[in-house]
Amino acid sequence: MTTQFSVAGVELELLRYPAQQESNLQAWDAADEHLLKSLIESEQAAVPTAIINDSFGALSCGVSKLNPSWPLCVETDARTSFLGTEQNHGRNQLPLDNLQWFTSRDTLPENLALVLMKLPKNLSYFAHQLTRLSQVLPAGTRVLVAAKAKSINGALLDIFAKHLGPASASLAWKNTRVITCVSDGKPRPLAKEVTWTVPEYQLEISNLSNVFAANKLDIGARIMLENLPKGDFKSIVDLGCGNGVLGLRTAQLFPEADIHFIDDSEMAVASAKANWARNQLPADKGHFYWDDCMTHLPEEVQPDLVLCNPPFHQGEAITDHIAWQMFLDARRRLKDGGILHIVGNRHLAYHVKLQRLFKNCTTVASNGKFVILQAQKK
């Protein structure tokens, strides 16, 4: 794993969060390099600057390295991005007091002079971010967005034009391009909230823009709902909760239980919390955490059931370390006799990991694509 970042005279040591020494994944990509290189070569840096979708702090550390006093507004939806950026600033002895933190639901300041941004995988979320920028940026403000060259096409440039202003792409460098968009100064309204029902469980659901499965029940969640465990559960964790549909259903099945919703996405946690209220579930039984797995879950929470639909992507990277951390955290936090109940794609072979960690693993259900697995802490 490479940890030494070097571009246009900026030297940094950067690690992903959480640090995975055995991983071959690094904390930045060529798009980060291209964006920072373009900024330095153009000599058009401006303050205050907003940095959006900075995976682990390569951009904010790079800009701070150039001038530690520059005020930076850092926006992220991912808790791991927030924690990774903090750690990488400390690792490179860069100040944190010049950073102002924002989630993707917060309103950015109106005096921004420049925006540096990575293109997210979810284009609905990207449109939401551009729309929010349109509400605060004066006409003429530059927004620089870096992405893989293969992701940039006419349809993407149309998204810029629709939600913020005209845009053009640079020449390719290391298979990436930097798009320059100039705000037209016209504020756009945010998209209306979309709600949908899961009639077989009498649930009404809505998702914010960066939450998986925008307006329907995804296949993995559906098979999970059809195969929830039976028992007398008092403390349940919906780990990687997304819109919270699994936790909502368990609240119906186990009305005496406390349900703890955890996700790396702030929008997911906000969606789960809104859906809890929307479905008129008891306010004192739902608990919500924006966190990296169960890293900061209060010690007094000792679940007897953990439900989990692990992601196998972190941004653009395909990785199983998130699932592995979820399983490790579940084993650490479950009560003796407690159950980890998961759904996953068959090809991911999660049964091997569960057998290794728990010394037991049962196949509860399966179809051509998904498998439901259960392991018990003994």
UniProtKB/Swiss-Prot annotation:
Q: Which CDD domains match?
A: AdoMet_MTases (cd02440)
| Gene Ontology molecular function terms on file | 23S rRNA (guanine(1835)-N(2))-methyltransferase activity; nucleic acid binding
Task: State its Enzyme Commission number(s).
Answer: 2.1.1.174
Per UniProt, which keywords does this protein have? Cytoplasm, Methyltransferase, rRNA processing, S-adenosyl-L-methionine, Transferase
Q: Which domain of life is it from?
A: Bacteria
Q: Where in the cell is it found?
A: Cytoplasm
Q: Name one Pfam family in it.
A: MTS
| Reactions catalysed according to its record | guanosine(1835) in 23S rRNA + S-adenosyl-L-methionine = N(2)-methylguanosine(1835) in 23S rRNA + S-adenosyl-L-homocysteine + H(+)
Q: Is Nucleotide-binding among this UniProt entry's keywords?
A: no
> Which GO CC annotations does the UniProt entry carry?
cytoplasm
The record's section on InterPro entries has: DNA_methylase_N6_adenine_CS (IPR002052), rRNA_m2G-MeTrfase_RlmG (IPR017237), RsmC/RlmG (IPR046977), SAM-dependent_MTases_sf (IPR029063), Small_mtfrase_dom (IPR007848)
Q: Which family does it belong to?
A: Belongs to the methyltransferase superfamily. RlmG family.
What the protein does? Specifically methylates the guanine in position 1835 (m2G1835) of 23S rRNA.
Q: Which HAMAP family match?
A: 23SrRNA_methyltr_G
This one is known as Ribosomal RNA large subunit methyltransferase G
